[in-house]
Design a protein with these regions (language model features):
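Conserved catalytic-core segment of NTP-binding enzymes
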Residues: 82-98, 116-126
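Generic structural signal for conserved hydrophobic packing positions in ordered secondary structure
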Residues: 24, 59-60, 87, 123
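Conserved nucleotide-binding/hydrolysis micro-motifs of P-loop NTPases
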Residues: 17, 41-43, 80-82, 107-112, ...
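Canonical P-loop GTPase G-domain recognition
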Residues: 110-164
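Inter-motif core of Ras-like GTPase G domains
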Residues: 52-80, 92-104
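Signal for well-folded cores of large energy- and translation-related assemblies
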Residues: 3, 61-68, 95, 124, ...
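Conserved G1/Walker A P-loop phosphate-binding module
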Residues: 1-50, 157-164
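Amphipathic alpha-helical transducer elements in NTP-driven molecular machines
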Residues: 18, 53-57, 145-148
Length: 164
């Protein structure tokens, strides 16, 4: 969605297929290189063993906590669903680790009218039970390219702010 190159990252209709950390080198408008990193999802890998899920969890935690140059993490949430405990737990953990993050609600085009807003509002209310303020939120659709420009602007802003 971000690059407009459909074949850049392998996708699957089955959640939980990403099993490795994938790095994508990006050349900024200022000609400086930076990396967009795709981590395995933490929620859906129902077809793999508990041991494999634990290994992924440890790998993700280690990556997030030890990356001194990590500028921001994007937590992708399927907008078709109400808040899931695993998502709330992960976000809570990011807060405890003091990792900056934004939430990207995906697949907004797959919902019935009004469902995305209801689900996002429920998610926000759930977070505000524990958080004083909300992280930056984005509503996106890869198919319709909705939210793409807003997300790219946010990434550019982060890059400009944290670029050496």
């Amino acid at each position: 969605m971000l690059t407009g190159q459909q074949r850049l990252a392998k996708t699957s209709s089955t959640p939980g297929k990403t099993q490795l950390i994938n790095h994508f080198e990006v050349l900024g408008t200022d000609k400086k290189k930076w990396y967009l990193v795709d981590l395995p999802g933490y929620g859906y890998a129902a077809t793999v063993s508990q041991k494999a899920r634990n290994n992924w969890g440890n790998m993700i935690e280690s990556y997030i906590r030890k990356r001194e140059n990590l500028v921001s993490l994007f937590v992708l949430i399927d907008s078709r669903h109400l808040p899931q405990a695993i998502d709330i737990d992960f976000i809570r953990q990011l807060g405890e680790w003091q990792v900056p993050f934004s939430i990207i609600f995906t697949k907004t085009d797959k919902n019935k009218p009004g469902a995305t807003i209801r689900n996002v509002e429920t998610f926000k209310k759930t977070l505000l039970q524990e958080w004083q303020s909300l992280p930056t939120l984005f509503l996106t659709s890869a198919e319709k390219k909705e939210g793409r420009e807003e997300l790219l602007f946010h990434i550019r802003s982060l890059h400009e702010t944290f670029s050496p």
